[in-house]
Regions:
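Mature N-terminal, pre-catalytic/accessory segment of carbohydrate-active enzymes
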Residues: 1-45
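Short, well-ordered coil/turn segments that N-cap beta-strands
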Residues: 14, 43-45, 111-115, 179-183
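Active-site beta-loop-alpha junctions enriched in small/polar residues
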Residues: 21-23, 52-56, 122-126, 188-192
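Aromatic/hydrophobic pocket-lining residues that form π-stacking "cages" and hydrophobic walls in ligand
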Residues: 35, 106, 117
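Conserved, mostly hydrophobic/aromatic
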Residues: 39, 117, 185
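Carboxylate/His-rich catalytic cores and anion/metal-binding grooves
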Residues: 43-58, 113-120, 124
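Aromatic- and acidic-residue-enriched carbohydrate-binding clefts of CAZyme catalytic domains
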Residues: 55-112, 127-165, 194-207
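Active-site groove signature of glycoside hydrolases
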Residues: 123, 167-194
Length: 207
């Protein structure tokens, strides 16, 4: 007696989010390729790549090199429990980012296996690493540090013309790397604390 196996995806979109905000894995290009192999085997067809965060900017941007010189690295990382008093940090510089060459290699590898890579560039929240790299993007105009721990932070993009120009430039470089018709722009967890105290933001709100 012959058996017939019918194998198909359950949903039109089978998505997997890959988040490296906290850690850059050693030899991570090869690691990601192995992950993609596993996703293909399990019939996933979308690889959602979380590339920017408060704790680190993980994608090369040529027009704004300080995103990688400053924003891709933090001076310390929380160790122990978030609720510890006092909190403990390792006081060790840590970070890294993916070059455009590496990203193209990963996207090509995924596409050959039927997987679409969707980049995520967070805005307006989860942008502390970017604001630290280019302080004019924030309400205070001052460096704020790349976040050394997880959480939701008040340092978000300010509604200045410079900010919108910056974000448009970022998106222009990102879409050149990813053939996906989608790009994720976050939109979550954006405290309005600084906006409420910012004259520029209040003027925009009142328009």
């Amino acid at each position: 007696m012959k058996n017939k196996i019918i194998d198909c995806i359950t949903f039109f979109n089978e998505n997997f989010i890959f988040d490296l905000r906290y850690n850059i894995i050693k030899d991570s290009v090869d690691f990601i390729k192995k992950y993609i192999d596993g996703l293909a085997m399990l019939k996933f067809n979308n690889f959602h790549w979380h590339l920017t965060e408060d704790q680190g900017w993980r994608i090369e941007i040529e027009k704004y090199p300080e995103l990688n010189n400053i924003g891709s690295f933090r001076d310390s990382t929380l160790i122990g429990h978030y609720g510890d008093k006092p909190r403990q940090f390792d006081k060790s510089r840590y970070g890294g980012f993916y070059t455009k060459k590496e990203i193209k290699e990963i996207v090509k590898y995924a596409n050959k296996r039927g997987i679409n890579v969707i980049p995520e560039i967070e805005m307006p929240g989860h942008s502390q690493a970017a604001v630290d790299s280019y302080p004019m993007l924030g309400c205070s105009g001052e460096q704020v540090g790349v976040a050394p721990l997880w959480g939701v932070f008040k340092e978000i993009y300010c509604s200045k013309n410079e900010t919108f120009d910056f974000l448009e430039d970022i998106i222009d470089e990102v879409v050149e790397l990813f053939p996906s018709k989608y790009i994720h722009i976050g939109g979550d967890e954006a405290p309005k604390t600084n906006w409420k105290a910012c004259g520029n933001c209040q003027d925009v709100i009142k328009r």
